[in-house]
């Protein structure tokens, strides 16, 4: 099994190009089921993307892959979909597999999808997915670990209020409603840029969607959708991760290929800590200027601070000049990186959904283990900040969500290699 060897102590300097967004491309790939052909560009090279390709192929899709140096293009032909079951062996690898449920059901009237896996950070129940589908007329049973869904004729538009904000359920509801009969109005929706990107792709395919980027989305169902070509937006979580990497190594890095407005809340939080952050053409520049203040943080649905960046921010706060309180409001089990950071000398105490971080002068290299995707990269950031050697195990988590991470960091001076 591979591991990463990190020799820290070098400030990162240079530029990093941001890849396509994992959390946008996966639902867009699922949306290909709604039409006959979808051409997607700026596709990142990630294992989760490979898993979604395998899943779509298992349903009968034909996928052409055009490889470029830094990205893929995918041409997904779904006119011969002939299998409506998403098997456990594929679905267990990735929770995003649940997003084929809506498209299969709304277009073909039936779907059987294994209850998803792929993540250790919380229960992330599918109750809201099921509730909105039932509200649109679907008949659903859960048997032997599978969601069995069917409909008699087209699903019907409805008015539906999500009990709590759910990115995943918002996506599935949108994917269903674009082919449902009549008008659907969804309340308390997720507002994430990746949801906006999915909606923009669906509009390119001929969907009628209003209220994009707000908590109230109105969709008028169409009889069918068109072939289309679409470029996926850049990954704000990857961008934020490298912004924190620049800060924790006392570096100066240009983050390129990202719209400033979708990382502005990250930039503002960094500015609070004393880091200089300025917009540049097609990106943002992050510069350490000699101080790192402790700052409190709460994760919340967008436009709040992303839970997917909480672990990286915590790594930064371990070296701050005071005490910070980090509150995790999205997932109940997202402090699994804390024991590993403490192995490196961090002073962190967890109380429920809150972590109290007392800054220390320096972290120390150690052998540590990744527990999930975002926790793994937080340990890399911690390792880069030390003046010693860190060994990170179970790095297969990284490949689910970060393309060419070692290469991008090495190009900015980091001593990091996979063995």
Curated annotation (Swiss-Prot):
GO BP of this protein: cell division; cell wall organization; peptidoglycan biosynthetic process; regulation of cell shape; UDP-N-acetylgalactosamine biosynthetic process
Residues reported to bind UDP-N-acetyl-alpha-D-glucosamine: 95, 164-167, 308, 330
Cytoplasm is among the record's keywords: yes
Keywords, alphabetical: Cell cycle, Cell division, Cell shape, Cell wall biogenesis/degradation, Cytoplasm, Peptidoglycan synthesis, Pyruvate, Transferase
Gene Ontology cellular-component annotations: cytoplasm
TM ranges: none
Residues annotated to bind phosphoenolpyruvate: 22-23
Main location: cytoplasm
Reaction catalysed by this enzyme: phosphoenolpyruvate + UDP-N-acetyl-alpha-D-glucosamine = UDP-N-acetyl-3-O-(1-carboxyvinyl)-alpha-D-glucosamine + phosphate
Record's subcellular location: Cytoplasm
Post-translational modification 2-(S-cysteinyl)pyruvic acid O-phosphothioketal, affected residues: 119
Pfam assignment, any one: EPSP_synthase
Active site: 119
The protein's annotated pathway: Cell wall biogenesis; peptidoglycan biosynthesis
EC number: 2.5.1.7
Gene Ontology molecular function terms on file: UDP-N-acetylglucosamine 1-carboxyvinyltransferase activity
Broadest EC class assigned to this enzyme: transferase
HAMAP family referenced in this protein's UniProt entry, alphabetically: MurA (MF_00111)
Biological role: Cell wall formation. Adds enolpyruvyl to UDP-N-acetylglucosamine.
Family: Belongs to the EPSP synthase family. MurA subfamily.
Name this polypeptide is given: UDP-N-acetylglucosamine 1-carboxyvinyltransferase
Originating organism: Rickettsia rickettsii (strain Sheila Smith)
